[in-house]
Design a protein with these regions (language model features):
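Central regulatory/effector-binding core of bacterial HTH transcription factors
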Residues: 1-53
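C-terminal regulatory
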Residues: 52, 56-131, 136-161, 180, ...
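Structured beta->alpha junctions
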Residues: 29, 156-157, 171
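Structural motif
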Residues: 1, 50, 97-99, 171
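Short alpha-helical
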Residues: 2-5, 31-32, 121, 140, ...
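Conserved beta-strand core positions
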Residues: 21-23, 67, 165
Length: 194
């Protein structure tokens, strides 16, 4: 969920600040970020939403990301302009699924026919091809909306919303200087609206 521009900004600055420190980057979604930190696969995770408090995990707020409903310009919901309440239920909704838990709660699902996808890249691809509609992080689809490849849907029952993003780490293995610097970088990005 963290916008790519923020990841790239932080990692370029990290490389300049800590040129001898190795880094391993995994891109995961939803609960898989938490799972990697809990299971000690990753020392530090950045993502969200993390609604529940997990014992032994520290959370540091690093901003928000806006989610907007979008579809391809030829999709019936895009062609309709402003829709009536319930219009989204009659169309395939593409939903990001939490691969870390088959019992994770759904978020923002109103469609009666859903296609569940494991990553935002495949969801983005299918949205652009008109296969369904769904929520996406606004920074990820901004250029597509500006260039007319996707349409920000005006749906009566759905409005855009933001999710909170956090840096997380285990309290028994707090980040060292490089990890602490990276958390501070992500937090400072959110202060300037990056």
């Amino acid at each position: 969920m963290l916008p790519a521009s923020r990841v790239v900004d932080a990692l370029k600055a990290f490389r300049a600040e800590f040129p001898t420190v190795s880094l391993r980057l995994n891109i995961e979604a939803l609960g898989a970020v938490m799972q990697m930190v809990v299971n000690r696969v990753a020392t530090l995770g950045v993502g969200g939403p993390f609604d529940e408090v997990v014992p032994g995990i520290e959370r540091v707020g690093v901003g928000t990301v806006e989610l907007i409903p979008v579809a391809a310009p030829n999709h019936p919901l895009a062609l309709a302009g402003q829709t009536t309440p319930g219009a989204g239920r009659g169309h395939v909704q593409l939903v990001l699924t939490d691969r870390s838990s088959p019992h994770a709660p759904d978020r923002g699902v109103i469609g009666t026919q859903t296609w569940r996808l494991g990553d935002l890249g495949s969801k983005h691809m299918l949205l652009r091809e008109g296969i369904g509609w769904g929520y996406m992080p606004e920074p990820m689809v901004r250029e597509d909306v500006e260039k007319g490849r996707l349409v920000h849907l005006d749906m009566a029952e759905i409005k855009s919303g933001s999710i909170r993003l956090f840096a997380i780490y285990r309290t028994d293995t707090p980040p060292g200087p490089a990890g602490s610097w990276l958390i501070a970088r992500f937090a400072s990005q959110s202060e300037v609206g990056s």
